[in-house]
Amino acid sequence: MMVEKRHEQLGLNEETVLDMYRTMLLSRRIDERMWLLNRSGKIPFVISCQGQEAAQVGAAFALDRQKDYVLPYYRDVGVVLTFGMTAKDLMLSGFAKEEDPNSGGRQMPGHFGQKENRIVTGSSPVTTQVPHAVGIALAGKMEGKDLVTFVTFGEGSSNQGDFHEGANFAGVHKLPVIFMCENNKYAISVPIEKQLSCENVSDRAIGYGMPGITVDGNDPLEVYEAVKEAADRARRGEGPTLIETVSYRLTPHSSDDDDRSYRTADEVAEAKTKDSIKTFGAYLKETGIMDDALEKQMNDEVMIIVNEATDYAENAPYPKAESAMNHVYAQK
């Protein structure tokens, strides 16, 4: 039976969709390694992307990596890898080493930032990145620049004031912002049905005068299509879009959480049957783009990258104690 080549309908060639899969795979393997390092006492904290790689990579591939700004939230390994960060960068951050590009070993893992690639630094209070994304979009519009800002957050963050204030301002001023809510069903331990009185996070868009769409967060092609359309709309001066990607958080909230206290093993096992690493891999095989040999080759190549990044970061120097106050204030 012939399988519909959906990627071709989106203007994506085989090389691009393989690159998407490779980036998803790298995200997963980095994340899995971080958990092993944490459990062996080598790094202090992990906050996971597992289960959300398809949404992150599909979205990031739909943006212009030469001029758009991304304001990722703490799970967005797939976004930052697509925009130019490396496995080595992320490992240096995990180990809090001097070369950590996010903060020189000062920030917690998951607080991504890399000025050269327009990855804007985030802070620990959730949703603070949303007003920043709106501000960058406002500046871009005032200066006549062709840029879009892309900001992500969890469905729990969509209940914070920063989201509503940012969305309202962007809607009123028709700013080129893409708000992407990565709905992974849980705000730490609070399930989605105890967070919303409406059916979908995207239903909130109408109150701010923007389109809202809910898509399958396990399908990178569906997410790509939605984000590409939102980016095109923003560049035409038609304003912001709210996109909700629905997936499932496959790990505990963080390395400090025990998810067995609020969800069942059967629920997690059911979600793993829809894991995008498996389902997108199956699509690539069904369309003849990837076979078992290529899949093994890609896995092997990714593991070499992860192993080299781990070894480098583990052996890299820590920041010097006398540098502790650097970068607290602006420096000449």
Kindly give the residue locations of the regions a language model identified.
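Conserved acidic/glycine
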Residues: 1-55, 61-62, 251, 257-260, ...
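A generic secondary-structure signal marking the coil-to-beta-strand transition
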Residues: 22, 66-68, 108, 177, ...
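N-proximal short alpha-helices
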Residues: 3-7, 28, 64, 102-106, ...
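Cofactor-binding active-site loop characterized by glycine-rich and histidine/acidic residues
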Residues: 32, 36-173, 191-197, 202, ...
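A general secondary-structure junction signal
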Residues: 74, 245-247, 328
